[in-house]
Amino acid sequence: KIFKVRKKGAIVSSNTSSIPIKVLSQHLSEEEKKDFCITHFFNPVRYMGLLEIVKNENNDLDKINFLKKFCEIELGKGAIVCNDTPGFLGNRVGVYAMQIAMTEAFKMKLSVEEADAIFGRPMGIPKTGIFGLYDLIGIDLMGDVLKSFIKELPETDKFHEVAKEIPLVKKLIESGFTGRKGKGGFYRVNKTDGKKIMEALNLETGEYSPSKKINIKTEKVDLKSLINRDDKYGKYAWSVISKIIKYASSLVPGITKEFNDI
């Protein structure tokens, strides 16, 4: 409908965060495909600077470059151009980062609270931390996202290594503990003697106990100091960030041609 009323040559874009261009444009003519792309704004749009412009092989590159400059100058966004691949760039790296933060916490036998204290504000991540973020998004929804990536990505992609099913997570979903929208998740609020108590899940036993505040002696972003700590927190931080960097760098030039975009 939009293509019927647009000015000839005008750019038409979708704000989808995951649906491939090849799917959205399957009913467009070859001429219309030249002017169609994806402009993925991250929420909340007012505060998030990142904007992904996803192109396809049919696009007029002059128009894509014009759109990029317009979004940077007029909208004040940090616009990057990427190819039509699963999850585009932001979600591909973001979901991998979440998964590696979770799997490394299991591997290193950290508690939910310890992992969230590190993979949180000290690493420039929202204060929810990794497990709190899982609860916020929905543990079951994240499971569906992982299945989608597993289906779409080639077997050689390192994403498969961090997307393997975790028995405890599977049990949570099956029991209705899907996060904040469910009966709880890695955290839950329990009432005892009329008082609300925040509880955290023990990753080894699967049992809940009162959540503990972990003091790692820093709440500000200080990644350099964090990864150089000679304790389990420093080792966890370095293991997570080094694997994220390694994976992200492997996506050039498949998703984008510039390392700066990553």
What label would you give each PLM region?
Residues K1-D261:
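N-terminal glycine-rich phosphate-binding loop for ADP-containing cofactors
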